[in-house]
Amino acid sequence: MIRGIGVDVVDVARFARSAERTPGLVPRLFAPAERSLPARSLAARFAAKEALIKALGGPGGISWQDMEVVRDEHGDPSFRVAGVVAQVAAARGVTRIHLSMSHDAGLATAFVVTEGDAP
């Protein structure tokens, strides 16, 4: 059963400029394993994290560090969640998080669907 959906779009060049202007931005938004990726990949991961927050209903108190985009053995993206994000997901009955990301023509997009068992 679908529990939530979220989508986000990020302008890659604008994100890159923000990251250059604000040295603490990348460490605040991304887990250590994500930080060395190129701007287009970071922008897509930021869009993914924004989309996940929307899919979870936009709760406050979430740490960006509690959401990490990882790749499985086939290269497919997924989330590793912890802390408040994991607690909110569990409280909302979320048992699966589906993620799709793309970047093209200067834009990064992400779409998230959260699922859970029927009540």
From Swiss-Prot:
Q: Main location per UniProt? A: cytoplasm
Q: What class of enzyme is it?
A: transferase
Amino-acid positions noted as binding Mg(2+) in the UniProt annotation, renumbered to this chain: D8, E50
Looking at the keywords, is Transport present?
A: no
The places in or outside the cell where this protein is found are: Cytoplasm
Tell me the domain of life: Bacteria
Listed under GO cellular component are: cytoplasm
Q: Which GO molecular function terms does the record list?
A: holo-[acyl-carrier-protein] synthase activity; magnesium ion binding
- Give the catalysed reaction(s), semicolon-separated: apo-[ACP] + CoA = holo-[ACP] + adenosine 3',5'-bisphosphate + H(+)
As cofactor, the record names: Mg(2+)
A GO BP annotation? fatty acid biosynthetic process
Q: Pfam families from the entry?
A: ACPS (PF01648)
Q: What is its EC number?
A: 2.7.8.7
Give the matching InterPro entries: 4-PPantetheinyl_Trfase_dom, 4-PPantetheinyl_Trfase_dom_sf, ACPS, Ppantetheine-prot_Trfase_dom
Q: Which keywords fit this entry according to its UniProt record?
A: Cytoplasm, Fatty acid biosynthesis, Fatty acid metabolism, Lipid biosynthesis, Lipid metabolism, Magnesium, Metal-binding, Transferase
Would I find Ribosomal protein among this entry's keywords? no
Q: NCBIfam families from the xrefs?
A: acpS, pantethn_trn, PRK00070.3-2
* Summary of the function given for this chain in its UniProt record: Transfers the 4'-phosphopantetheine moiety from coenzyme A to a Ser of acyl-carrier-protein.
The family this protein is said to belong to: Belongs to the P-Pant transferase superfamily. AcpS family.
What's the protein here called? Holo-[acyl-carrier-protein] synthase
**What organism is this sequence from?**
Clavibacter michiganensis subsp. michiganensis (strain NCPPB 382)
Q: Which classification does the entry list for the species? A: Bacteria, Bacillati, Actinomycetota, Actinomycetes, Micrococcales
